[in-house]
Amino acid sequence: MKPKVFITRQIPENGIKMIEKFYEIELWKDPKAPPRGVLLEKVREVDALVTLVTDKVDKELLENAPKLKIIAQYAVGYDNIDIEEATKRGIYVTNTPGVLTDATADLAFALLLAVARRIVEADAFVRSGEWKKSEVGWHPLMFLGYGLKGKTLGIVGFGRIGQALAKRAKGFGMKIIYYSRTRKPEAEEEIGAEYVDFETLLKESDFISLHVPLTKETYHMIGEKELKLMKPNAILINTSRGAVVDTNALIKALKEGWIAGAGLDVFEEEPYYNEELFKLKNVVLAPHIGSATHEAREGMAELVAKNLIAFAKGEIPPNLVNKDVLTSSPP
């Protein structure tokens, strides 16, 4: 008899086809996340769970899952999962690193360009008919933005995605500085990046892009103090986690001109609505689509499947997050 898995959202079919060879699948087909009560009910009878970042896997849920042995997260980040509690209960937790690196780096750079060159603002100007009404065909001062060549890009968090972004920026002639918990000498040499402390990065960067996980240490690491250290022409990009930035402080900074603009793909609460933020023209917003390419999402589905299949075969999943679990619950 196959073990049971509950998948909390429709993932690409390539992953489903791989998983169904080893598991009995129950799939939540509604695009909205399953209600809390439904999720608590479903986990009671399953051996495996496939989750998204919007699924809260806390102590309460784990207490309701006596048979649960593995949680396969369909994402790189896993701040929605109580890793410590899962490990205590001998539950494996896996993620999907690597396959979404290029997609997320592409989006970060797209946001950077969109804000710097005021692309969304210009698009709205044309579509709304305002350009026609203005009777100004072309003007030397129309929609002036910022060029990239020779500018400094500060990258906070220099893992796979941060390094991929740096390589793209190099092609635009940008100078790269970075701050990370640990220095990356090999990457510094390969890419031509310079390690600096956090305060120096904030003060010297023309563009700042965030690529850190959400932890107690990174929560609101960009707040009023940090925003005031940045250049008045600086642009902030966030494709990591929304709570890394204090939203209220950012709104104040954008309104009062402490910084020039921002590009956000993530928010403190998702789905997100803030009328005050939405009125600002110097911010470009996206609905958490960092990995939203066919290639990345299919690659993530394949990794989820590989992690589940390895576990079903009595092997260590290739992307095991909580390796301490092997001490109490070896495969």
Curated annotation (Swiss-Prot):
GO terms for cellular component: cytosol. Keywords: Cytoplasm, NAD, Oxidoreductase. It catalyses: glycolate + NAD(+) = glyoxylate + NADH + H(+). It is found in: Cytoplasm. NADP(+) binds at F158, G159, R160, I161, S180, R181, T182, T239, S240, R241, H288, I289, G290. Homodimer. The active site is at R241, E270, H288 (proton donor). Disulfide bonds: none annotated. PANTHER family: 2-HYDROXYACID DEHYDROGENASE-RELATED, GLYOXYLATE_HYDROXYPYRUVATE REDUCTASE B. This is Glyoxylate reductase. InterPro entries: D-isomer_2-hydroxyacid_DH (IPR050223), D-isomer_2_OHA_DH_cat_dom (IPR006139), D-isomer_DH_CS (IPR029753), D-isomer_DH_CS1 (IPR029752), D-isomer_DH_NAD-bd (IPR006140), Glyoxylate_reductase_GyaR (IPR023519), NAD(P)-bd_dom_sf (IPR036291). PROSITE patterns: D_2_HYDROXYACID_DH_1 (PS00065), D_2_HYDROXYACID_DH_2 (PS00670), D_2_HYDROXYACID_DH_3 (PS00671). CDD domains: GDH.
